[in-house]
């Protein structure tokens, strides 16, 4: 079996070798054929290139010859030469042939006209000669000729009169038929006019009712606006009185603080050792880690970004601003829906009125003049009512803006006072998300009364005051909106923003500058006291 397998393998190997030899021979033959074909193609390419060059030269020569022939055919006519310069010889030849044929046709027509006129001239000359050769007529013949001409003229006049009378007779018949038809149609038109009169009367009554309703609505809106303005002015005056009282209290506190600072400065000068120890303690407290400083800078940058995005000067105003924006969005969406409904109603009314106007235009009668005058009056009344409605809408928009501003201020106060807890013996209002404006006002009023009472009852402590002042100054030192606040008169502007922004961009000194000024004053006073002692 092994010998048989080896023989079969050797036979297969020999067959494969013969196949590979044949494939190599075929490949060599293919390569030779390809080389021969490439050589033939190169030769044909050279021949074709030479033929192309010759053809291009022949084409250029033919073009030049065509241009020369066109210029020779056009002669001195530059416009024709420019018109046919870029075209081929065949196109130029066809155009010139058309031009020549047109000129030949016009020439033939003119020759024909000249011949006809010559024939007419010859006939007229012959008539002249015949008339000159005739003998002169007698008086009787002349009279007869005049009578004949008069009779011919009279006959023509009578014929014209007869034709005109016939035309008038037919016209009168047509008019009679038309008038009969119109008389037959008049009763139906009278019925239509009566119906139109009834419809117009009903529309007039409806329009009067509409105008009266609009007047009533505008009067009610004006009353509500006046009442709202009066209540707003009273509330604003009350708020301003409270703010003035608080301002007076703050001024008193500031005066006390300055006096206490002066006393402390004197004590520090009397006891320098105590001052050194206190300064060392403060320096130790101020030494903070680098991580805390980096965290504080990150927090401040984030807060500044939020403030710049929301356009608020305080952190506690951001939530109020978002709530105000939500309220304004909801109100604007409601207004948009109302406006769309009104627009659809007005479009339907406009279509109806346009249809009625078209009907009236195409069916106007002498009795419709009165309706036109009434319609003009009604249009004027409608324009006046629309102007009043626009004024009322403007007033309503102003009132809505004012209400939105008031709501934002109340929301800001509510958010500021929400963290203050009342004592147990006082009834605290439950905080809920569904509080209306009046509920928020009551809540803020209770908290503010509690805070005012607590401020009056609290005893002043120097250390606590200094700590609070230091924290406030350090927190508001780097703020851009760290400016003084001025209170405007109530008569200047009826709208209050409740956002105590940059009203008076006055200079606010820092804590270091205040310390320097205080030390300078203390040193000057001590020098004066030492000089007096000496």
Swiss-Prot record:
Cystines in this chain: none
This protein's record includes keyword Transmembrane helix: no
Coiled coil (UniProt feature): 10-54, 136-209, 321-406
InterPro entries: CCDC183
The UniProt record lists the keyword Ribosomal protein: no
Keywords tagged on the record: Coiled coil
Source taxon at top rank: Eukaryota
PANTHER family the UniProt entry points to: COILED-COIL DOMAIN-CONTAINING PROTEIN 183
Protein name as annotated: Coiled-coil domain-containing protein 183
Gene source species: Mus musculus (Mouse)
Gene name as annotated: Ccdc183
């Amino acid at each position: 079996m092994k010998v048989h397998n080896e023989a079969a393998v050797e036979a297969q190997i020999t067959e494969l070798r013969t196949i590979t030899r044949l494939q190599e021979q075929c490949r060599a033959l293919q390569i030779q054929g390809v080389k021969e074909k490439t050589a033939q193609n190169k030769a044909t390419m050279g021949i074709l290139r030479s033929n192309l060059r010759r053809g291009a030269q022949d084409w250029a020569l033919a073009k030049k010859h065509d241009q020369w022939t066109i210029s020779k055919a056009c002669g001195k006519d530059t416009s024709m030469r420019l018109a046919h310069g870029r075209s081929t010889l065949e196109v130029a030849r066809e155009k010139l042939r058309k031009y020549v044929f047109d000129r030949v046709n016009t020439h033939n027509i003119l020759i024909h006209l000249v011949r006809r006129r010559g024939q007419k001239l010859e006939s007229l000359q012959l008539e002249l000669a015949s008339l000159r050769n005739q003998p002169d007529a007698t008086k009787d013949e002349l009279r007869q000729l005049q009578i004949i001409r008069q009779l011919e003229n009279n006959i023509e006049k009578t014929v014209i009169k007869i034709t005109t009378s016939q035309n008038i007779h037919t016209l009168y018949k047509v008019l009679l038929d038309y008038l009969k038809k119109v008389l037959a149609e008049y009763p139906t038109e009278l019925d239509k006019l009566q119906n139109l009169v009834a419809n117009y009367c009903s529309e007039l009554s409806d329009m009067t009712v509409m105008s009266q309703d609009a007047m009533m609505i505008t009067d009610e809106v004006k009353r509500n606006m006046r009442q709202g303005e009066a209540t707003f002015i009273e509330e604003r005056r009350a708020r301003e009185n409270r703010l003035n009282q608080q301002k007076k209290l703050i001024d008193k506190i500031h005066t006390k603080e300055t006096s206490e600072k002066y006393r402390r400065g004197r004590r520090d000068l009397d006891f320098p050792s105590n001052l050194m120890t206190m300064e060392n303690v403060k320096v130790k407290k101020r030494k903070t880690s680098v991580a805390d400083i980096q965290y504080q800078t990150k927090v401040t940058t984030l807060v500044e970004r939020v403030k710049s995005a929301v356009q608020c000067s305080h952190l506690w105003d951001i939530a109020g601003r978002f709530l105000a924006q939500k309220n304004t969005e909801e109100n604007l969406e409601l207004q948009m829906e109302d406006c769309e409904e009104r627009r659809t109603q007005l479009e339907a009314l406009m279509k109806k009125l346009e249809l009625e106007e078209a009907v009236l235009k195409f069916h106007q009668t002498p009795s419709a003049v009165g309706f036109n005058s009434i319609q003009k009056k009604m249009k004027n009344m409608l324009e006046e009512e629309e102007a009043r409605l626009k004024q009322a809408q403007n007033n309503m928009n102003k009132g809505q803006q004012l209400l939105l501003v008031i709501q934002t201020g109340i929301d800001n106060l509510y958010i500021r006072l929400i963290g203050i807890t009342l004592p147990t013996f006082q009834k605290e209002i439950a905080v809920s998300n569904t509080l209306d404006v009046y509920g928020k006002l009551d809540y803020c009023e209770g908290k503010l009364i509690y805070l005012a009472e607590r401020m009056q009852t609290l005893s002043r402590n120097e250390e606590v005051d200094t700590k609070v002042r230091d924290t406030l100054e350090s927190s508001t030192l780097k703020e851009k909106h760290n400016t003084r606040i001025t209170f405007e008169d109530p008569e200047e502007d009826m709208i209050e923003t409740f956002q105590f922004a940059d009203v008076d961009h006055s200079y606010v000194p820092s804590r270091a500058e205040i310390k320097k000024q205080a030390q300078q004053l203390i040193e000057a006073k001590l020098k004066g006291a030492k000089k007096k002692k000496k």
